[in-house]
C-alpha cells in the first residue's frame, strides 16, 4: 500500500513539476535573451560608439590587420560599425552576426551609407556556417560577463570551425 501511494504521489508530483517547468527558459536562454535586449538598446550602442579610444583602437587594428580581399566575421556586430570599417578596408566579404534586434538598425545604416559586401546574419555564432573559411574574426566579446555569456566558448567554437589556419582573431 505504501509503495502504491509513493508511486501515485510521486507521479503526480512529477507531472505537476513538469507543468511548472514548461516554458521556463534555461539559464543560458535567459541570459541570451537579456543580452540581446541589452545590446539592442540604441542608448548602449551610442555609448559604445562615443567611446573614442575604443573606436580608434578598432579602426587602427582593422587598418593594420585586415587585408584587401579578406573574408571577415564581425561577431556581435551591433550597429555594424566594425563590419563597415572592414568593408572600407577592402574585405571581399564581411559577415555581420548578431542575435539581437539591433541587426535591423545595422542593415539600415549600411544601406544608407552604401556599404556593400556585408551580409547581416541574425543568428547565434554557434549556428553560423559560412560558405568558406574566414581570414579574420572581429569581436568585442569582452567585459565582466566574459564567462557568463560563454564568450570564450563562442570565440573558440568559431575559431575551430570557420577560421583559416593562420587566421586572426581581433582583438
Task: Give the positions of each predicted feature.
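N-terminal auxiliary segments of SAM/dcSAM-dependent transferases
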Residues: 1-27
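Class I SAM-dependent transferase core
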Residues: 25-66
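Conserved class I S-adenosyl-L-methionine
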Residues: 69-76
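Conserved SAM-binding loop of SAM-dependent methyltransferases across substrates and taxa
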Residues: 79-90
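Conserved SAM-binding motif I beta-strand of class I
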Residues: 93-98
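S-adenosyl-L-methionine
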Residues: 107-131
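A short glycine-rich, Lys/Arg-flanked "PGG" loop and its adjoining helix->strand segment in the class I
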Residues: 152-165
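Conserved beta-strand signature within the Rossmann-like core of class I S-adenosyl-L-methionine
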Residues: 165-171
Amino acid at each position: 500500500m505504501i509503495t502504491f501511494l509513493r508511486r501515485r504521489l510521486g507521479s503526480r508530483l512529477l507531472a505537476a513539476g513538469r507543468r511548472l517547468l514548461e516554458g521556463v527558459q534555461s539559464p543560458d536562454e535567459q541570459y541570451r535573451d537579456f543580452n540581446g535586449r541589452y545590446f539592442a538598446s540604441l542608448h548602449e550602442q551610442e555609448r559604445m560608439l562615443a567611446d573614442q579610444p575604443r573606436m580608434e583602437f578598432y579602426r587602427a587594428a582593422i587598418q593594420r590587420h585586415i587585408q584587401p580581399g579578406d573574408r571577415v566575421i564581425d561577431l556581435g556586430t551591433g550597429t555594424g560599425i566594425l563590419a563597415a570599417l572592414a568593408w572600407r578596408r577592402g574585405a571581399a566579404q564581411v559577415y555581420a552576426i548578431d542575435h539581437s534586434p539591433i541587426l535591423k538598425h545595422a542593415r539600415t545604416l549600411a544601406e544608407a551609407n552604401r556599404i556593400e559586401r556585408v551580409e547581416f546574419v541574425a543568428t547565434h555564432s554557434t549556428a553560423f556556417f559560412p560558405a568558406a573559411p574566414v581570414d579574420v574574426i572581429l569581436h568585442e566579446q569582452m567585459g565582466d560577463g566574459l564567462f557568463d555569456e560563454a564568450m570564450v566558448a563562442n570565440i573558440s567554437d568559431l575559431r575551430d570551425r570557420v577560421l583559416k589556419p593562420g587566421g586572426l582573431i581581433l582583438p
